[in-house]
Amino acid sequence: MFVHKTLKMYFPSAFAAPKFAFGLLCRDSTGKNVLLLCFRCSKICLWLILSRLNRVKMYCYSAFAAPKFGILLELHYLCTKYKRMDNRQATLELGTKPVGQLLMQYALPAIVAMTASSLYNMVDSIFIGQGVGAMAISGLAITFPFMNLSGAVGAAIGVGASTYLSVKLGQKDYKTAELLLGNAVVLKIITGILFGAVCLLFLDPILYFFGATENTIGYAREYMQIILVGNVATHLYFGLNALLRAASKPKQAMYATIFTVVVNTILDPIFIWVFDMGIRGAALATILAQMLALCWQLSIFSNPKEMLHFKKGTYRLRADIIKNILAIGISPFSMNACACIVVIFINTALVRYGGDMAVGAYGIANRIAFIFVMIVMGIKQGLQPIAGYNYGAQLHSRLIHVVRLAMLAATVVVVAGWVTGQLLPYYCARLFTSDQTLINHSIQAIRVNMLLFPLIGYQMVVTCFFQSIGKAKISMLLSLSRQMLFLVPLLIILPPIFKIDGVWAALPASDGIAFIVTWVTMETYKKKLRTNAQQ
């Protein structure tokens, strides 16, 4: 044990006792006690209250008898060894606790965080649309490929490292887990700097390639200049959040996301309207919110009392660790990179057949769908450490069970999204703009884009499942099937025939074909898992 606080002395004026009393109290951070032992004698009374070994605190109370007053002495200790033991115990629960409770425990904070994240992006769009104008919404939509590309680079490291970390924790390889943390942070910094510098250098040509016109290039440029300057903070923020979830700290990851939403929501109207910064103000609010949350994340991983924390010697890049991170991260990288390519195709087709307003409508439709997609992402993030751990521990029956629960939860969410998109498209569009032309385009975009929305929950969970168990090739194939292999050919074939309707129709058609491929792949693998579980 280690002395955590110095001796404290209290002199309660009305306190007196006829006998000497000494008490030893062990209490966890929640204040719950699970065992009480009481020893009595004529001279001394000893209370020993034991609780779970989570942030164990030990208090020693002594009440010395006196006619008029008593002296209360308090000794306060913190046993850091037990704190680390409890962190490891929390990780071991991934293989023993009922999977339904685990999924709720891990997914709920992630769902709250992802919902907050979707609102975070939605708030930006609402303030830009209402405060700057309809054309600014179109300019913001032009930047979506940038976000996808940045997300692709970040996911290659962040998701790859967090998934690999879950597997290593399942194997109880804590030394490799520490090396993973250090290597992931260094890679995040390097890629963040390189990505931001290259994109800033060729910003205008890239934006025109992404579908910008003379009407939208100014808005897109102003927004991306600030976003790219703060790109390192963005990469670190999202990467450390993924590592927090993998390290059995989903609540801390949730708090970080909620914090960014609150700060961004407060700063957006101040920068856009009070300081009259326009779309630049929205970008600045986003970066500042992420930087503040990043400071808190770094404080968690800098705490030596944590089971997983920054250590000297873990920042030197190791080829074997980088290889494993990228092998797993190639799937989410491909998914985001393909999303970037697809959005470029969509923007180009929309500008050609529908004009800038059609691009803005796609941006609004994306934001509405994004809310429900991010909730499913929360379910996926809750599933990832559970699936990774149980796969690493060879607990196949638990693995199948938790995947089924995740599929059910994801399907409920996307069905709710489908109902919203089909019944309330006008009110959804009206949140972002008062321009009637943009609203009319958006109603069509929302309804058609979400036509087969109930199918994507299953597809997303299955992709996450294969990613979590290290099946990078299968996960990448399924990701490509929905976002690249089917959608791009449809975007090439349908628009010349059906014009703007062909662009919208390509999206649900791709969802339907990808669902069939995903279902066949998953059923085949489930049979293999059942066979292993029976053996």
Regions found by a protein language model. Give the residues of each.
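Short runs within selected transmembrane alpha-helices of multi-pass transporters and secretion channels
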Residues: 158, 227-245, 256-264, 282-295, ...
